[in-house]
């Protein structure tokens, strides 16, 4: 059977080794004679799984001891509201850096739950002759001005990634749904990190939250119990029944990451994959990318065909070649190749080979 490479932005492809293991033990997990989906989340077997998952994640990301690791319901949008409700209180203010579609969505959700006066924004993207780049101004001010600064370091829709550290006098909250564990970061620089699982961690329905102790002392608003960080900490992420199968798969992905060399090794592979694709695009007169080199995402490579009339044929022929889910987001059009941790370099090589052949056949 030929290999299909899935370039979907999310839910994204999972490591083949993880999928095969899940398949092999779907009906009999850990010798229990039942599926991991069928056992109690409070059983000793499942608790052992969750403990191992947290230990592995802490090791992979070098998470300090003064941070809690939570496994919560929902995706990034759920955390948009959870952050506001957990940290702003009735009169708190927050600063949101806007670099693309997802950071804009975070602002929209925050303003639904607060007064406009509580949410300030700062646009980071500047456009120079059709090329988008991120410009981060110096951030100064009294620490009491904002409860937190929120930003999204990787914008999946726009193909923009912020690699430089944000120097903020306020606690930093980061939406790392699409680039968590794709490269090394210093967790101690953040007040909170959240990530929907469906790109680099596992299937949809689960979110990872990494929160520093002192953030839990901020005033909160009344909210749903299942999105209350303090309750999640108190009850070990099990105040109510968690998405157990998603948690199990995340645990297997963490094992796979460790066996693959960890985040540092993954970062090297990811850089090679992205460079291979961007170099081909830049050397072509048939494809183009509209993001400045210093802000091109390593996870989501957007590109456009010189003639949009070829888009439908490109997608159809790519699918027949085993290269699926390459259509760009409806808001920006074009194409998008999402090359998260689970995408092997062979998938990118095959994509480049296909793109080259398609261009030769249709150019001119």
UniProtKB/Swiss-Prot annotation:
Please list the cofactors this protein needs.
pyridoxal 5'-phosphate
Q: Which residues bind pyridoxal 5'-phosphate?
A: 76-77, 102, 156, 175, 198, 240-241
State its location(s). Cytoplasm
Q: In which pathway does it act?
A: Amino-acid biosynthesis; L-serine biosynthesis; L-serine from 3-phospho-D-glycerate: step 2/3; Cofactor biosynthesis; pyridoxine 5'-phosphate biosynthesis; pyridoxine 5'-phosphate from D-erythrose 4-phosphate: step 3/5
Reaction equations catalysed? O-phospho-L-serine + 2-oxoglutarate = 3-phosphooxypyruvate + L-glutamate; 4-(phosphooxy)-L-threonine + 2-oxoglutarate = (R)-3-hydroxy-2-oxo-4-phosphooxybutanoate + L-glutamate
GO CC annotation, single: cytoplasm
GO biological process per UniProt: L-serine biosynthetic process; pyridoxine biosynthetic process
Q: Where does L-glutamate bind?
A: 42
Known EC number(s)? 2.6.1.52
Q: Which domain of life is it from?
A: Bacteria
Provide the positions where the record notes the PTM N6-(pyridoxal phosphate)lysine.
199
Q: InterPro entries given for it? A: Aminotrans_V_dom, Aminotrans_V_PyrdxlP_BS, Pser_aminoTfrase, PyrdxlP-dep_Trfase, PyrdxlP-dep_Trfase_major, PyrdxlP-dep_Trfase_small
Gene3D superfamilies attached to this UniProt entry? Aspartate Aminotransferase, domain 1, Type I PLP-dependent aspartate aminotransferase-like (Major domain)
- Cofactor comment: Binds 1 pyridoxal phosphate per subunit.
Any single GO molecular-function term of the entry would be: O-phospho-L-serine:2-oxoglutarate aminotransferase activity
Keyword annotations? Amino-acid biosynthesis, Aminotransferase, Cytoplasm, Pyridoxal phosphate, Pyridoxine biosynthesis, Serine biosynthesis, Transferase
| Subcellular location, principal | cytoplasm
Give the EC class as a word: transferase
As for family, the record states: Belongs to the class-V pyridoxal-phosphate-dependent aminotransferase family. SerC subfamily.
Its annotated function is as follows: Catalyzes the reversible conversion of 3-phosphohydroxypyruvate to phosphoserine and of 3-hydroxy-2-oxo-4-phosphonooxybutanoate to phosphohydroxythreonine.
Q: How does it assemble?
A: Homodimer.
HAMAP family recorded for this chain?
A: SerC_aminotrans_5
Protein name according to UniProt: Phosphoserine aminotransferase
Q: Which organism is it from?
A: Shewanella sediminis (strain HAW-EB3)
């Amino acid at each position: 059977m030929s290999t299909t490479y899935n370039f979907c932005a999310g839910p994204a492809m999972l490591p083949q080794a993880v999928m095969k293991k899940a398949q092999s033990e779907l009906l009999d997990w850990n010798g229990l004679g039942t599926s991991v989906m069928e056992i109690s989340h409070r059983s000793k077997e499942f608790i052992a799984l969750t403990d191992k998952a947290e230990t592995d994640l802490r090791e992979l990301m070098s998470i300090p001891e003064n941070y809690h690791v939570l496994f919560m319901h929902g995706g990034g949008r759920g955390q948009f509201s959870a952050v506001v409700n957990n940290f702003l209180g009735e009169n708190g203010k927050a600063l949101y850096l806007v670099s693309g579609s997802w950071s804009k969505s975070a602002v929209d959700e925050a303003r639904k739950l607060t007064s406009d006066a509580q949410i300030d924004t700062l646009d980071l993207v500047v456009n120079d002759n059709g090329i988008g780049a991120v410009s981060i101004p110096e951030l100064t001010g009294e620490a009491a001005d904002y409860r937190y600064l929120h930003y999204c370091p990787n914008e999946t829709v726009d193909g923009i990634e912020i690699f430089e550290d944000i120097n903020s006098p306020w606690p930093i909250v980061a939406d790392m749904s699409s680039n968590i564990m794709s490269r090394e970061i210093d967790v101690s620089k953040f007040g909170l990190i959240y990530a929907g699982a469906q790109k680099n961690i596992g299937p949809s329905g689960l979110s990872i939250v990494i929160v520093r102790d002192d953030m839990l002392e901020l005033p909160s608003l009344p909210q749903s119990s299942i999105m209350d960080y303090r309750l999640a900490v108190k009850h070990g992420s099990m105040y109510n029944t968690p998405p157990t199968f998603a948690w199990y798969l995340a645990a297997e992905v963490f094992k796979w990451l460790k066996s693959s060399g960890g985040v540092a090794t993954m970062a090297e592979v990811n850089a090679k994959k992205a460079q291979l694709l961007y170099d081909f695009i830049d050397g072509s007169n048939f494809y183009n990318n509209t993001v400045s080199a210093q802000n091109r995402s390593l996870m989501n490579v957007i590109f456009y065909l010189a003639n949009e009339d070829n888009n439908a044929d490109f997608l159809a022929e790519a699918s027949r070649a085993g290269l699926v889910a390459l259509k760009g987001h409806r808001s920006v059009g074009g194409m998008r190749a999402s090359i998260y941790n689970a995408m092997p370099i062979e998938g990118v090589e095959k994509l480049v080979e296909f793109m080259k052949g398609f261009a030769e056949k249709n150019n001119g």
